[in-house]
Amino acid sequence: KSIILAKKKLEIRLQGKLGDMLYLTKSSYGKINKKRVLSRNKKKKILIAAHSFCDAPHARGKGIFNDFYEWIIFIFELSEDSKFDWYIKCHPNFYEYFDDTVIILKELLKKYKNVKWIEPQTSNSQLIKEGIDLALTVDGSIGIEYPYFNIPVINASENNAHINYKFNYHPRNLNEYKNKINNFYKLKQKIKNNEIFECYFMNFLYFKNNWFFSSFDKVINYHGGNFT
């Protein structure tokens, strides 16, 4: 029953509906735009799923990088001498955040020109359809979502919600991380959907939202939809 419920809930999320992540007010899986986003070429395409710089970078524990900013700088530097197409996208909720992540990223892209900016409102469904080959995150929920479409995800921290499962890659150090990115197309990963559903259930359905607050919904609404 748990697997069936998780499958249903995950598929609802991937249809662009909000639900199990109550702190979000916008979905990353909205309508597909007719205008193409990814370049039409034969290069492998990598998506950098950016984190808000202030959004609890140490909440789960230490990662390969000290924070989300250092992670971004490393990835941008890696893109400078690369045979891949690189893209970066923020969550659509970023425009409602109170930090300057979007501003800082756009300023950095003036220097790192191999990375292309994708508007946050662009649907992940569109990127998947157009042919993203790899997604990068530190510990984000894209690690559950993209593998469902057989797209590999490489995390930049072993302290992530998917660590006990094999549908993500979990490098242990910087050298391994760099090597996995540069050679991701050689990696052979057999994704089992039931593992994805189990992980989704344990992360988003097993624990009640009101375990800390008497009403989590009221807290989120009080803060205008933001929790960080």
Predicted feature locations:
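C-terminal amphipathic helix plus adjacent low-complexity
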Residues: 1-42, 174-228
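Conserved catalytic-core segment of nucleotide-activated headgroup transferases in glycan assembly
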Residues: 11-106
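Structured mid-domain segments that build the active-site/substrate or prosthetic-cofactor binding neighborhood
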Residues: 77, 116, 123
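Short acidic-hydrophobic, aromatic-tinged amphipathic segments that line or gate anion-handling sites
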Residues: 116-119, 168-180
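A donor-sugar binding/catalytic signature common to diverse glycosyltransferases
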Residues: 120-168
